[in-house]
Amino acid sequence: GCSSSEILGEHIGKGSSPETGVVVAEAILKVLNENGIYLAAQCCEHLNRALVVERAAAEKYMLDEVCVRPMPKAGGSFATAVYDRMSDPVMVEHVKAHAGMDIGCTLIGMHLKDVAVPLRLSVKKIGDALVTAAYTRPKLIGGVRAHYPE
């Protein structure tokens, strides 16, 4: 999730910047594509926090497609830029991601697997936006007698 408004020091959703969305989208897509990692870009609450993903990811993970296209004022500038730059984008309602990054307090937790572990990053802000991240781990089950691999 990414708020271009927050990056620019505005209240989330109040200063959407397509130019900022493009810069962030291109930087993130470059790194993820080089490492074979699929991006799920979260839209704003006007699109119920739907996500932009590559069709290949939607098919691989059996995600249900929804019919909408993000725009800067309905979905957000970042999601719009990602949609415009993916080779075959589709929109989905839900994912259960292994990890996530939140730029500007966009509340990505609903799209992570159940046990999220905070990840401390060296970069705390992008522009004026707070940056938080998490990875996930399997649930520990079994109680006091259970043993877990290291």
Q: Where are the language model's segments positioned?
A:
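Long, hydrophobic N-terminal alpha-helical segment
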Residues: 1-38
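A glycine-rich helix N-cap at a beta->alpha junction
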Residues: 61-88
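N-terminal intrinsically disordered, cationic/polar leader segments
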Residues: 54, 72, 76, 122-126
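Short, catalytically relevant binding-site loops at active-site mouths
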Residues: 4-6, 45-49
